[in-house]
Structures are given as structure tokens and as C-alpha cells.
Amino acid sequence: MEKIGYLNFIDHTIELEEKFLPQFTEGTSQHSLLRNRIQALKTARDLISRESQPTRDELEFALPRIESIIHKMSKARDKYEPEDKNYKRFDPTVQVMTHVRAVILQALEE
């Protein structure tokens, strides 16, 4: 997948998660989790697009949230065989977030 593909995927994911945010009461753990995940995705988008350079604190904040997405999507994906439609539904998220994690780790090393 190319840079534009990653950015489109991340933007689409942000849009979907922002639609779910109002369903949770502010102050609940679900609301905080989703808000933090959206912020992590926005940080990743900024880093990959080079629109702005996220701070070290923003990158350190984003990394565990991205790793959480990878973990949860991998567990969901691995319940299915690679030919299954559900496997194919979860796999792109795992691949994109794995790339995002690598980019964040690289930025943190610099």
C-alpha cells in the first residue's frame, strides 16, 4: 500500500470512529478510549502526511493506542481462516496499523 492509501485508510477510520463518539456519554471509559484512539490516528495521519510534525509526547501518547488497535484487530482476525470474509475485513486494519506503528517508532528514534 502506498502513502496515499495509508492516509485514505486512516482518514476513513477517523471518520467512522468520530461518528460513534456521540453514542458514548462524555466521561465514560468508552468515550475516553474512543477519543484517545481518534487522537492517536490523527497524530499518525499528520506524521505520515508530513502536514505537521507531531511532538515526542504526541507520538508517545499515540503508540500504545495504535498497538491496542493492532492487538484487538489481530485477535479478531485470527479467529478466522485467511479465506474467510471476516479475516479479509480485519486484515487491512492490522496491516495499516502495523505500518503506522513502524513509522511512529522510527520517528521516536530520531
What are these regions (language model features)?
Residues 17-21, 45-46:
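Short charge-dense sequence patches
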